[in-house]
Amino acid sequence: ASRELWVTFGVKFLGVMAYKVTVLTLALWLMVDFGYGDAGAGNLVAAWSVSMTVVTLLVGSLTDAIGLRRTFFLGVWICVGARAVMAFTTIKWLALAAGLFPLAVGEALGTPVLVAAVRKYSTTQQRSISYSLFYTIMNLGFLVAAFLFDYLRQSLGERGQLTLPLVNCQLSTYRTLFFAAMVIEIAILPIVYFIRRGVEVTDDGIHVTPEAPRQAGDNLWSAFWRTVGEGAKGTLKLFRGLVQQAGFYRLLAFLMLIAFLKLIFMQM
């Protein structure tokens, strides 16, 4: 198996751990730290889940435009930043606007891309066992996350506090759980670095397509903004073609159904 396939498995394990800890914490954090009622917290979690589903529709076009590796990095950095806001801020509007809903974007950038990565980085013979391992690792990550959630919550108590050394910052029980999820998310970054640029696995072997060289005279920032612009244009072009397909609306209906099923499981 290619190195990139093992990297994908590692990213999946850590990613679902961070995601599951977050999902288990969300409603309790909203109620205990910000005083929301059960219905209000449920409505916000519902909006978060639906927004994640909506962003998922755009991810395929974005990935085609900027590539798997860049999409991985973009999603992880957004998740790290959003979880940092949720862990350290006590300002309600900031936690929601710069934490909760950006996190939906970051999570949406990761999940479908990982599924595509398994296909891209495995041969035809490896694909069946690769997807079996992928979903086994996902369930293992959920299991470990549940134990981590229970351990931290029981250790600190419902309204406990954790004082971080060096910075002398106090975190509530549920912000501590977001902090733990952020640390797990940060651990993904060095793993993603091992994905080689332009790699694709076929039945004939591993092929590496060199990236186009940067234009002469470009500095880092100008190259970055040009990549952003080209990625945005490519994403919009691909998405316009997508919405003209009849199957797109069937997919949309299916994803909305999945979103509401997720809400049911999150409230159980």
Identify the meaning behind each predicted range.
Residues 77-92:
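C-terminal ends and interior cores of transmembrane alpha-helices
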Residues 13, 82, 94-110:
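Hydrophobic core of transmembrane alpha-helices in multi-pass small-molecule transporters
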Residues 43-61, 143-145:
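Central cavity-lining transmembrane alpha-helices of secondary-active solute carriers
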Residues 1-3, 126-128, 150-266:
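Intracellular loop-helix junctions on the cytosolic face of multi-pass helical membrane proteins
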Residues 24-41, 267-268:
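Short amphipathic helix-loop junctions that connect adjacent transmembrane helices
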Residues 55-68, 153-154:
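Helix-to-loop junctions at the C-terminal end of transmembrane segments
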Residues 109-123:
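Intracellular juxtamembrane helix-capping segments at the cytosolic ends
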